[in-house]
C-alpha cells in the first residue's frame, strides 16, 4: 500500500545513474544501514567509489537495523569505513558485530558542551509527545491527575503529528522546542529524541513506559535514566536528577581523520 519497494527501486536506479555520471572517488552520507543504503554501497563499490558512512544518530536499544547480521550479504553491503559521532556510537556498533577495522570516531558539530544548563525545580515539566498517538494518549491520561493536583506541565506535540487536548491552567500546550524553553524542572518523553536532547543538556529526564506497546528507547545502550509507567510517574518526576552524557555521545570533530578519509591522496 505504501509502494515502498517501487520507491527503493527508483532510488537505486537514480543512485546508479548519478554514480555513472559523476564518477566520485569517495561518497559519504548519514548512515543507518537501511535497505536503500545497502544497495547504494553495492552500486557504489561496482563503480569504484569508496564508501564512508557517518553514524549520526544514536545506536540505541532495539535498533537492530544497524546490525550487520541483518544484511543478506553480511559485510559486503557495509561501507568501507564508518565514522562515528562519538564513543557511544562506536561501542554500540562493535557490540552489534561490526568489524573494528572499519570503525573510527569522526566527532560531531551538532552539539557543544556549552549547551548544558541547569533545571529549575519550580518550573513546569516539559512533556515531549511521540509520533504514536496511542502512547501520547497514555501520557496525557497519566499527567492529567498530577496537573489537577497542582503540578504544572507544558506539552509539546511531535512536529509531524499534532496532538489535540484541552488546556487547563496547569496543563498547557507549547510550540516551543526544548532548547527554547527558558525554565524546565523535568523532561518527560517516550520514543522521541527529545529525551536524548534533554540528557545532553544535563536536564532531569524520565522515560514514560506505556502499557501494551513497545516504546523504543532512543538513548544509547549503556546509559540509564529513570523510567516510569502511569502508576509510578509522580514519584519518578519528583526524584529525577540531571545527568550529562554529551561528551560520550558526541566527540569533538576530528578534522584530521575527516581529511584523511575524504582526500586520501592529499595526505600521502
What is the meaning of each model-derived region?
Residues 1-109:
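Active-site and donor-binding regions of nucleotide-sugar-utilizing enzymes
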Amino acid at each position: 500500500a505504501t509502494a515502498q519497494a517501487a520507491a527503493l527501486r527508483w532510488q537505486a536506479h537514480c543512485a546508479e545513474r548519478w554514480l555513472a555520471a559523476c564518477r566520485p572517488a569517495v561518497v559519504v552520507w548519514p548512515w543507518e544501514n537501511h535497505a536503500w543504503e545497502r544497495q547504494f554501497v553495492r552500486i557504489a563499490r561496482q563503480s569504484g567509489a569508496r564508501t564512508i558512512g557517518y553514524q549520526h544518530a544514536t545506536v540505541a536499544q532495539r535498533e537492530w537495523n544497524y546490525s550487520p547480521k541483518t544484511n543478506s550479504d553480511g559485510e559486503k553491503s557495509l561501507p568501507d569505513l564508518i565514522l562515528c559521532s562519538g564513543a557511544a556510537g562506536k561501542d554500540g556498533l562493535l557490540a552489534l558485530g561490526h568489524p573494528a577495522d572499519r570503525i573510527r570516531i569522526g566527532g560531531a558539530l551538532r552539539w557543544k558542551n556549552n549547551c548544558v544548563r541547569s533545571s529549575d525545580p519550580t518550573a513546569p515539566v516539559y512533556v515531549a509527545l511521540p509520533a504514536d498517538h496511542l502512547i501520547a494518549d497514555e501520557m496525557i491520561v497519566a499527567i492529567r491527575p498530577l496537573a489537577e493536583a497542582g503540578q504544572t506541565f507544558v506539552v509539546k506535540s511531535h512536529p509531524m503529528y499534532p496532538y489535540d487536548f484541552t488546556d487547563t491552567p496547569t496543563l498547557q500546550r507549547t510550540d516551543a522546542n526544548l532548547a527554547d524553553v527558558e525554565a524546565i524542572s523535568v523532561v518527560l518523553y517516550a520514543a522521541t529524541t527529545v529525551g536524548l536532547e534533554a540528557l545532553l543538556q544535563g536536564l532531569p529526564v524520565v522515560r514514560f513506559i506505556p502499557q501494551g506497546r513497545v516504546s523504543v528507547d532512543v538513548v544509547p545502550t549503556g546509559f540509564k535514566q529513570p523510567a516510569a509507567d502511569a502508576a509510578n510517574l509522580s514519584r519518578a518526576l519528583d526524584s529525577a536528577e540531571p545527568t550529562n552524557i554529551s561528551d560520550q555521545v558526541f566527540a569533538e570533530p576530528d578534522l584530521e581523520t575527516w581529511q584523511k578519509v575524504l582526500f586520501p591522496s592529499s595526505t600521502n
